[in-house]
């Protein structure tokens, strides 16, 4: 389930970046720059589902042929990816670079420290990914226990 979340998050970002529509904040639904954590597009959410289903298909094809297991892995992956976006928009640290744009990078390309704009300082993108993966794995385990 955690692998499905990681793939769903990757597909959401990579496929969502191709969207012709501007991403919106998952919290406020206001436009945000492409690539900024917490931004979503319909194409990105669809990509998230494709990524989670890909991992789910590989799992059931290799280990266990079952539609409920497929649905469990895929849904926990998508839920985890949506949580990733929620955390990215709410608690993940964001900085403001010298041009005034929001970024996830603490330092600019010349090594100067960017000003913190929002978020909790120690919750960077890696921490958000870890929390989302743990959550997705836990949700998957709980759902597996319920359906078994």
Indicate residue ranges for each PLM-predicted region.
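Hydrophobic alpha-helical transmembrane segments
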Residues: 1-148
